[in-house]
Amino acid sequence: MGSKYPRSLRCCLPLWALELQTAFSLLFCFFIPHDTAQVDHRFMASYQVLRNLTLMAALGFGFLSSSFRRHSWSSVAFNLFMLALGVQGTILLDHFLGQVLQWNKINNLSSIQIATMSTLPVLISAGAVLGKVNLVQLTVMVLMEAMAFGAIRFADEKVFKMTEHIIMMHGHVFGAYFGLTVAWWLSRSLPRRVGENAQTEKVQMATSSSLFAMLGTLFLWIFWPAINSALLEGTKKRNAVFNTYYALAVSAVTATSMSALSHPQGKINMVHIHNAVLAGGVAVGAPGCLISSPWISMVLGLIAGLISIWGAKCPRACLNHMLQNSSGIHYTFGLPGLLGALTYYCLQIVTEPKSSDLWIITQTVTHIGALSFAVAMGMVTGLLTGCLLSVRVWRAPHAAKYFDDQTFWEFPHLAVGF
């Protein structure tokens, strides 16, 4: 008997997605004007930054999630769908918040750039649930997470007085814990043995898919300095670019060597390479602009690589079922992001020449408060989103259909009745 799930998706997805896109188009028509500023060298520089960010988001994160043997098509295509939807929603959210809160923000190429960076937490968190939800559920998740991260950006800017650069770096941590919380809640509704048996065979890696995932890793590795320096200028931008490359280089070497060391026969695990080589770039994202000597960023890359390998290898058996961390976002983005945020705080305290006790206390409260707020928002809104996605109206796939492209895609060479 054929599966009834594709029929429910046929009824639900076009109606929901097209209505949402029509609403977005009408809102853009009446409220979002084109930028009329003259095109100059600054426009082209902004476009180059936007191009690099889009390559990272579309190709890097898309292929990074394609390592599952029977879920590679969905990982790449759903990632692009979420990126396109998230950028539109974030631009509208920023515009209306600017109108209500009287922010002096112009809708130009920089707006698309910031919207793209604000959508990266969505792509990070999606790594924890891809293969377990359908496209309608992902649409709801994009909207919920975009609004939650918009609230974080507002609170960090107005309450904690954080710069836009640091706010975006907190997005790595927010996205990681948001996705982990959503995945944890969705897993609660499944019988333990049923969920494990359904996922064991499909989570296994295949050589071809691993190569595509490695391609995504390479895109992210090459272009990661773009995200760490996109919102900076002058000396800070230069420092961020240099230090990101140093940290990425060290984390790549650390990931390869430690992966071999952790195997009884000295063999390298491709999963470790997919994730751990990026940990240095995540860790140096916040403090990179303050680091004036390369050895500090290299040490950060080393520590981040060690943390990532440790997270992938040592506690995996006891934590994986609890955190639902099959994609590794916890030890690729979550833990290195926390390391980077704490390092930024320490460097700011050390590099300030005339720091008083009151200033140190103020900085401690604001930085720890902003970071804690991002983590708490990720968990709370992730829990709410998980509750919402578990409602039966979304026609979620059965556990037997997890990590299976045949649930969503047409395969002409297969039997028609699937």
UniProtKB/Swiss-Prot annotation:
GO terms for cellular component: membrane; plasma membrane. This is Blood group Rh(D) polypeptide. May be part of an oligomeric complex which is likely to have a transport or channel function in the erythrocyte membrane. GO terms for molecular function: ammonium channel activity. Keywords: Cell membrane, Lipoprotein, Membrane, Palmitate, Transmembrane, Transmembrane helix. It holds the Pfam family Ammonium_transp. SUPFAM superfamilies: Ammonium transporter. It comes from the Eukaryota. Palmitoylated. The chain crosses the membrane at residues 12-32, 43-63, 73-93, 112-131, 133-155, 166-186, 211-231, 241-261, 268-288, 290-310, 331-351, 368-388. It comes from Mus musculus. One of its GO terms (biological process) is erythrocyte development. It is found in: Cell membrane. It is a multi-pass membrane protein. Belongs to the ammonium transporter (TC 2.A.49) family. Rh subfamily.
